[in-house]
Amino acid sequence: MVRIIKWLIGLAVLSVAGALIAAAVIYFAIMPGLPDVTELKRVDWQMPLSVYSKDGKFIAEFGETRRSPVSIDDVPAQTKNAVIAVEDAHFYKHIGVDWRGIARAVWLTATTQDERVPGGSTITQQVARNFFLTNEYSYFRKFKEMLLALKMEKELSKDEILELYLNKIFFGNRSYGIVAAAEYYYGKKLEQLSLAETATLAGIPKFPSTGNPTSNPERSMIRRNYILQRMFEEGFIDREAMLSAQAEPNTAKRHEQQVQLHAPYLAEMVRIEMVRRYGERANTGGFKVITTVHSEDQLSAERAVRTGLMQYDMRHGW
C-alpha cells in the first residue's frame, strides 16, 4: 500500500513537472514573437470621413465604422463601473489574468445553462485579442492572449487599458466605442445617459449584433438587469437605484446623423479628391472636410436648374 502511495505521489510530481516544463517551453517559444504592446500608446483610430458645407451643414459620411474616441478622464464613473461589473470585477486588482475569474467561469459554464455567465477573459485580455489576435478559439491562441495581457499590464496603466477597451469594442450597427454607441442608440453624450441606459450599453459587446437593444430588446433588457444586479453586488449602486433602473422601459432607437444638405455629387467629388491625396486613409482617418459651398448657394443653384429645365420643357415640349 505504501509503495502504491509513493508511486502515485511520484506520478503526480512528474505530471506537474512535465506540465511546468511544457509551459516554460511554450512560453519561451511564443514570447519573442509577440507584438510590441507599446504600440497601444499611439493607436490610430479608424473614423469616417465627414463632409460639410461652408456653413456647417452635414452633407455625407464615408467609412465602415462609427467611432468617436474618448479620453478615460472624460468617461463618467457610472460608465466605468457598469463595464467593470459585468466584464471584469477584479480589473483593478489582477495582473492581466484573473485566475479566480477563469475558475468561476468554467464552473458556472459546466453547471448552468445561463448565457449571462461572465467569460474568463479579463478586460486586458479582451484588449489584447481585439488588437493583436483573432476570435478563433484555441488553447494556443488563449495562451498568447494571456501572455500579451501580462505584457500589457507592465507597459500600460489600468486606465490606459480601460480607455483602449472603451474605444475599441464593437457595439453593433457599425458603432465602435462607447461614445459612438451612446450617440447611435440614445442620441446622447456619455454624461447624459441614465443608469439604465449605461447598463444597457455595457451589455451589448457580448452579443453586439443579436443582443443590442434595437435588434433584440427583450434579450437586451434581461442582460441590462443582470448588469444592474452586478453593479449592486459590487457596491457601485444601492438597491433602490438598481430596482428603479430595472423598472425602466427600453428607450433605445436608431439615431442616424441626418443629411442637412443633399449634395451627393459634391460629396463624391470630395471623397475622390481625399482618396487621391491620402489614399485609403481618407476613409478611416476621421477627416472632417469643410467645402467652399454654402448651403443657401447650393439650394439656390438647384432651384435655378429646376426652374430652367421646367421653362425649357414648356417652350419645347417633350
What do these predicted ranges mean?
Residues S71-I123, G177-A181, Y186:
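Flexible, acidic/glycine-enriched loop-and-adjacent beta/alpha segments
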